[in-house]
From Swiss-Prot:
EC number: 2.7.7.6
Alphabetized UniProt keyword annotations: DNA-directed RNA polymerase, Magnesium, Metal-binding, Nucleotidyltransferase, Transcription, Transferase, Zinc
UniProt-recorded name of the protein: DNA-directed RNA polymerase subunit beta'
GO terms for MF: DNA binding; DNA-directed RNA polymerase activity; magnesium ion binding; zinc ion binding
Length: 1408
């Protein structure tokens, strides 16, 4: 019977749809949805619990409470299906129609929809061209609005107060019409002719010259165009009929004790109905206008609260003073419909438990507790029991399982075999946070996890929990096995390096095994093969670390064949034993060295590239088993005596104390300022800490060689003891990369060093003790600062980082690889990244896995070695490096010409798989995860070094890294001072070192004021100092000699005499014009002029302009009036801020600000054109800088006086070059230098932040996000298209429209790129469903409804929300096939389906 009933329940058909449209409902539409009018505020009868008739839960309107049974019980059972009971009027049908049938309320007076009124900018206001304030006054009955002026001089939309209205009525009688409330507004909207308005606005747009007016018109035009295009009538923004939600969606549940739990909506609806009924009665009674008005206002407020409580005025509250949850609150926010129920569904067949380590597992296995497995695999067990005939019904099978009879366990074993399960650890920050494993049944209640996948899950075994999910359908199991199995996720999608890398004890074991000990037992023995070594080791003839000679059999893979060769190596016993687990094809020298963490990672990488996935997985497992086994045998422990405090520590500390006293003396005698003293003291202690740490590491890192016969230390010829690398436990742990770092050991055994205050500044008294010696109370107290800051930071940053990830995912979620090749030849030129003369990232790393855009030519014989369109793999980049090619043009996601999505060639290699990317890969989400995931990790890691001020020592000189010849860059300018030193006076000067062939080896910036120690054309050796400068101050240097004459240097006006409290000496400091007392002096700037012997002003070379040097705010003037100065002398010093400690805390906000494309506070100014700089007349508080371009057109800039201008008179600047100091504004970079420069800027800046933390992310991911930030364009000239100048549209839409217009032979639109921050880009996407589920739900839906937007369900989010397969990965095939079939239905013919597509459709459960 039940099966039969179920058959009848399936009445609804599967809806097939391609898009979802949103719009405004007309009153007729609302009535057509409705099944009856709700007239009473009653809900259910408190005695019978039956719904009241015509009430909010009325069965007649909304349907029966029980399946196939009317309310009075006259008709029961299925046979009366569809009958309407004549007694109670209820249709006999399923009770679930109460979830979908709506009612309506006929409002006695129209009310405005609050979303269109109050959601800024107010749509009602825009359509009527009235201010929000005015509309509100009309709606809430404070003023009349003229709806039809007739022949009177009144204006349409004019507001009249009560008195005005009376006066005008007396004056004009019935010649005009004015009304109050929503009726007035509705009349205005009714009589609005949208077409005429649009034509008027377009005309006005052509004639107006004012920028603000233009903006206003274009906004209004956009809204009116939207109404006209969508066919929505503006008067529908005023509600005459209110729809009522189906009752099951706002349930009323009886609790024990006769009380009810109810949805807030019932309360809100009740208020609306009460007020509406009262209003109807008042209107019937012809009550006085003032009472009716009040009631209408209350109705308007009640409807406002129902739609969006708290949007206007005070929120309506329930009995317990809690604001009621309105319809808008139901859908928005984290707990709203979108994020809670549509995107965040819970999953059936899952369990969670604590994880413990499973060192005996293979990489593709996980240990699943039997109890858990039994529960999770129940349906499969029931099925098997039925098939085997052990249980006749499901009920019997259930009983069998509950009794846990022995046969059940056998069946469980059988069911589980080769049925993968998915493990997930929250927070799932990237796709490796969920992986599939084959379960192995274990006793106990904890899940066993393979140690090597911990890095991917970021899991440890200190109480972490994981969830298990069971894939049910065959397709799901297949996807798990082929795509999600842990053995298929060896590489990290963020950077393409192995993520299955041993850590901790495994590393320690392998490190110990491959270390070499001098004079160990059995040193120098020869062995014929590995088994001999193994036998000797097991019999204790040789030690693990002894150096021996052994013949090793290796396999070479050549042309797909394995060739065997035997070589004799000098190696150690441990390494020889490890060679047994090397996969065939890897040479022995790869492990014939000390294996540290980095080396092991390289080893696994080499194995993956040479031997493939399967071999690598087996190898990784073997490495793990070996590592654990040898770590146990090594018996490395940790104890207090391992922490050796260096003997020189006291001497270093006392020397530093002396230095500090000296600085204090200089300070008291006035030679240095307070800031300089602080900086120097901090520097001294920073250096002392480093020296102690170095001494400690030197001492820890070596130990004497012990003679095995005598048991004493061996000595060399000079009588000094011979030393070897140390076997100190702590040193080994840090050196191998297993645990701990030099910085942490330094705190254990060196000195803790400088600590930071919570605001980031450094306390100048360091902690000289270490943890081994113990801290005293004061030192402990200072330490608590850092520790507490670390913990507080962690909590805050986790939230910030999660939010960044969410925004990134949202902006890129619809970016999927949709085609093989878009055919473009554009790309970016990649060079090695060099900073401070150091190669930060080699060219090979930047182009690996990219596709070449142009042919790569061998520089020696001009032959093409790699044609355009080829993917560069490891061998190719090796060749490029070997040939010394400096730059390569590669394809990039930025220039990909695919309309929706990306093409595989522009993306290149799929980093997580090591192969070219497949069509259907969701590269956008992967990019977002790759950037977001380390953010969280880093922020969680701030507290590991307990706030010890790891302040980067400030660079004060550059040294050459290689031998070569020095060349100054063309931008370098310098002067020679009296001491015959060269002083750099250009801001962009660089020292370049070339090799003998003239190829550039390194390049270093020489800052303004640096002393150049090596001249152009000289030969340098590696390690030689090229230039030096004072890092703490920026000098202002004179390029001319003469006698100093001050102008406008007036004490208390432009400069302040600062007398140091301690020394009593005075210095002149330039003060901020804003802080000056006297108003007239605002424009004065302190200037130095130079006079020659005759007392005339020194002129600039080649011109008759006098030299005058201006000082910026904060400069400390070092010369005195009348003093004689020579070329290259310092006139003033500008103190630099003492640097605060930089950890990712500076980093995370920095990344967010880059991706949000925010303009920095004090942005620098870039030159708009290429031309010559000159200075014009200063105006109030600003200096005027003029750039005259090559055509003689001048461009003026007004720059605040306190800003530092980097360009000088007569200098030639290029377009986009910086002329005023300050951080760059990404919008300027895009405008002046183009997309490529912008991408390079954002990529480099983001990479800088992550590099500081040692996190590797491939540039590709950042480029993908920049592409999404640039996906909208602004129309400059609309041509013959339908766009409005200044409108922002999606690039793809713009190109499609232009193509269409060009086909018709008309003029296409021109446009410029717009840079949108990720939040803005997410909200301005074409898909309103995606935008609404991200942020600002109300605003997005309001806008979409007016425009009658259609969502084509292109992205991933939209499809998840409507409950479809996503158009990525395996779901892409399904979507393509559906499209193909739709085509077939439309045209009657279609390309044939492949067999696999047919199979996929059949299995996906969708009707073909």
């Amino acid at each position: 019977m039940k099966a039969l009933l179920d058959l009848f329940k399936q009445v609804t058909q599967k809806e097939e749809f391609d898009s979802i449209k949103i719009g405004l409902a007309s009153p007729e539409k609302i009535r057509s949805w409705s099944y009856g009018e709700v007239k009473k505020p009653e809900t259910i009868n408190y005695r019978t619990f039956k719904p009241e008739r015509d009430g909010l839960f009325c069965a007649k309107i909304f349907g029966p409470v029980k399946d196939y049974e009317c309310l009075c019980g006259k008709y029961k059972r299925l046979k009366h299906r569809g009958v309407i009971c004549e007694k109670c009027g209820v249709e006999v049908t399923l009770s679930k129609v109460r979830r979908e049938r709506m009612g309506h309320i006929e409002l006695a007076s129209p009310v405005a929809h609050i979303w269109f009124l109050k959601s800024l900018p107010s749509r009602l206001g825009m359509v009527l061209d009235m201010t929000l304030r005015d509309i509100e006054r009309v709606l809430y009955f404070e003023a009349y609005v003229v709806t039809d002026p007739g022949l009177t001089p009144l204006q349409r939309c004019q507001l009249l107060t009560d008195d005005d209205y009376r006066a005008k009525t007396e004056e004009y009688g019935d010649d005009f019409r004015a009304s109050m409330g929503a009726e007035g507004i509705r009349d205005l909207l009714n009589t609005l002719n949208i077409r005429v308005e649009i034509d008027d606005l377009r005309r006005e747009m052509g004639t107006t010259g004012s920028e603000t007016k233009m903006k206003k018109i274009s906004k209004r035009l956009k809204v009116l165009e939207a109404f006209s295009k969508s066919g929505i009538k503006p008067e529908w923004m005023i509600l005459a009929v209110l729809p009522v939600l189906p009752p099951e969606l706002r349930p009323l549940v009886p609790l024990d004790g006769g009380r009810f739990a109810t949805s807030d909506l019932n309360d809100l609806y009740r208020r609306v109905i009460n007020r509406n009924n009262r209003l109807k009665r008042l209107l019937e009674l012809k009550a006085p206008e003032i009472i009716v008005r009040n009631e209408k206002r209350m109705l308007q407020e009640a409807v406002d609260s129902l739609l969006d409580n708290g949007r206007r005025g005070k929120a309506m509250t329930g009995a317990n003073k809690r604001p009621l949850k309105s319809l808008a609150d139901m859908i928005k926010g984290k707990g709203g419909r979108f994020r809670q129920n549509l995107l965040g569904k819970r999953v059936d067949y899952s369990g969670r438990s604590v994880i413990v380590v499973g060192p005996q597992l293979k990489l593709h296995q996980c240990g699943l507790p039997k109890k858990m497995a039994l529960e999770l695999f129940k349906p499969f067990i029931f099925n098997k029991l039925e098939i085997m005939g052990i249980a006749s019904t499901i009920k019997a099978a259930k009983r069998e399982v509950e009794n846990e009879s022995p046969i059940v366990w056998d069946i469980l074993e059988d069911v589980i075999r080769e049925h993968p399960v998915m493990l997930n650890r929250a927070p799932t920050l990237h796709r490796l946070g969920i992986q599939a494993f084959e379960p192995v049944l274990i006793e106990g209640k904890a899940i066993q996890l393979h140690p090597l996948v911990c890095a991917a899950f970021n899991a440890d075994f200190d109480g972490d929990q994981m969830a298990v999910h069971v894939p049910l359908s065959l397709e799901a199991q297949m996807e798990c096995r082929t795509l999600m199995m842990s053995t298929n996720n060896v590489l990290s999608p963020a950077n393409g390096e192995p993520i299955i890398v041993p850590s901790q004890d495994i590393v320690l074991g392998l490190y110990y095994t491959t270390r070499e000990k001098v004079n160990a037992r059995g040193e120098g023995m020869y062995f014929a093969n590995i088994s001999e070594v193994s036998r000797a080791y097991e019999n204790r003839v040789i030690e693990l670390n002894a150096r021996i000679f052994v013949r090793i059999r290796e396999y070479e893979l050549a042309d797909g064949e394995r060739r065997e060769k035997i070589t004799r190596y000098e190696t150690t016993v441990g390494r020889a034993l490890l060679s047994e687990i090397l996969p065939a094809g890897l040479p022995f020298p790869l492990i014939n060295k000390v294996l540290k963490k980095k080396e092991i990672s390289k080893l696994i990488n080499a194995s993956f590239r040479r031997c493939g996935l399967r071999e690598t997985v087996i190898f990784a497992d073997k490495l793990m088993y070996a590592g654990f086994s040898y770590a146990t045998r090594a018996g490395i422990s940790i104890c207090l005596d391992d922490m050796l405090t260096p003997a020189q520590k006291d001497a270093i500390i006392s020397a530093s104390e002396k230095e500090v006293q000296e600085i204090e003396l200089q300070y008291t005698s006035g030679l240095v300022t307070q800031g300089e003293r602080y900086n120097k003291v901090v520097d001294i202690w920073g250096r002392a800490g480093d020296q102690v740490a170095k001494a400690m590491m030197d001492q820890l890192g070596v130990e004497p060689i012990i003679d095995p016969e005598t048991g004493t230390a061996k000595t060399g010829e000079s009588g000094k003891p011979l030393i070897q690398e140390s076997f100190n436990s702590i040193y080994m742990m840090a050196d191998s990369g297993a645990r701990g770092s030099a910085a942490q050991i330094r705190q254990l055994a060196g000195m803790r060093g400088l600590m930071a205050k919570p605001d980031g500044s450094i306390i100048e008294t360091p902690i000289t003790a270490n943890f081994r010696e113990g801290l005293n109370v004061l030192q402990y107290f200072i330490s608590t600062h850092g520790a507490r800051k670390g913990l507080a930071d962690t909590a805050l940053k986790t939230a910030n980082s999660g939010y960044l990830t969410r925004r990134l995912v949202d902006v890129t979620q619809d970016l999927v690889v949709t085609q093989e090749d878009c055919g473009t030849s554009n790309g970016v030129v990649m060079k090695a990244l060099v900073e401070g003369g150091e190669v930060i990232e080699a060219l090979r790393e930047r182009i690996l896995g990219r596709v070449v855009a142009n042919d790569i030519i061998n520089p020696e014989h001009q032959a093409v070695i790699y044609p355009a369109g080829m993917l560069l793999d490891e061998n190719a980049v090796d060749t490029i490096e070997m040939l010394g090619i400096d730059e390569v043009k590669v394809r990039t996601p930025l220039t990909c010409e695919t309309r929706y999505g990306l093409c595989a060639k522009c993306y290149g290699r799929d980093l997580g798989r090591g192969t070219p990317v497949n069509v259907g890969e969701a590269v956008g989400v992967i990019a977002a995860q790759s950037i977001g995931e380390p953010g969280t990790q880093l922020t969680m890691r701030t507290f590991h070094i307990g706030g010890a001020a790891s302040r980067t020592a400030v660079a004060s000189q550059v040294e050459s890294k290689s031998n070569g010849i020095v060349r100054y860059s063309p931008t370098m300018r310098y002067v020679t001072n009296a001491r015959n030193e060269l002083i750099a006076i250009s801001r962009s000067g660089e020292v370049v070192i070339q090799d003998d062939n003239g190829r550039e080896r390194e390049r270093h910036k020489a800052p303004y004021g640096a002393t150049l120690l090596i001249r152009d054309g000289e030969v340098v050796k590696a390690g030689q100092v090229l230039a030096a400068w004072d890092p703490h101050t920026r000098p202002i240097i004179t390029e001319y000699s003469g006698k100093v004459r001050f102008e406008n240097v007036e004490e208390g006006v432009t400069v302040a005499k600062q007398i140091d409290e301690v020394t009593g000496l005075s210095t002149l400091v330039v003060i901020d014009p804003k802080r000056r007392g006297v108003v007239q002096t605002k424009g004065l700037r302190p200037v130095v002029k130079l006079l020659d012997e005759e007392g005339k002003e020194v002129r600039l070379a080649g011109s008759n302009l006098p030299v005058h040097i201006t000082f910026q705010v904060g400069s400390i003037i070092t010369v005195r009036d009348g003093q004689q100065v020579s070329v290259g002398e310092v006139l003033a010093r500008i103190p630099q801020e003492s640097s605060k400690t930089r950890d990712i805390t500076g980093g995370l906000p920095r990344v967010a600000e880059l991706f949000e494309a925010r303009s920095p506070k004090d942005a620098g100014v870039l030159a708009e054109v290429t031309g010559i700089v000159s200075f014009g007349k200063d105006t109030k508080g600003k200096q005027r800088l003029v750039i005259t371009d090559l055509d003689g057109v001048s461009h003026e800039y007004l720059i605040p006086k306190d800003k530092h201008v980097t360009a000088h008179d007569g200098q030639v600047v290029n377009k986009g070059e910086s002329i005023v100091d300050g951080p760059a504004d990404p919008h300027d970079i895009l405008r002046l230098l183009g997309v490529e420069a912008l991408a390079r800027y954002i990529t480099d800046e983001v990479q800088d932040v992550y590099r500081l933390q040692g996190v590797k992310i491939n540039d590709k991911h950042i480029e993908v996000i920049v592409r999404q930030m640039l996906r909208r364009v602004q129309i400059v000239d609309s041509g013959d298209t339908r766009f409005i100048p200044g409108e922002q549209v999606e690039r793809a839409e713009m190109l499609a429209e232009n193509e269409q217009v060009e086909l018709e032979g008309k003029r296409p639109a021109t446009y410029e790129y717009m840079l949108l921050g990720i939040t803005k880009a997410s909200l301005s996407t074409d898909s309103f469903i995606s935008a609404a589920s991200f942020q600002e739900t109300t605003r997005v839906l309001t806008e979409a409804a007016i425009m009658g937007k259609k969502d084509d369900l292109r992205g991933l989010k939209e499809n998840v929300i409507v409950g479809r397969l996503i158009p990525a990965g395996t779901g892409l095939t399904f979507h393509n096939t559906r499209k193909r079939q739709r085509l077939m239905l439309d045209t009657g013919e279609a390309p044939p389906l492949s067999e696999e597509e047919t199979g996929e459709i059949r299995n996906s459960g969708y009707a073909v």
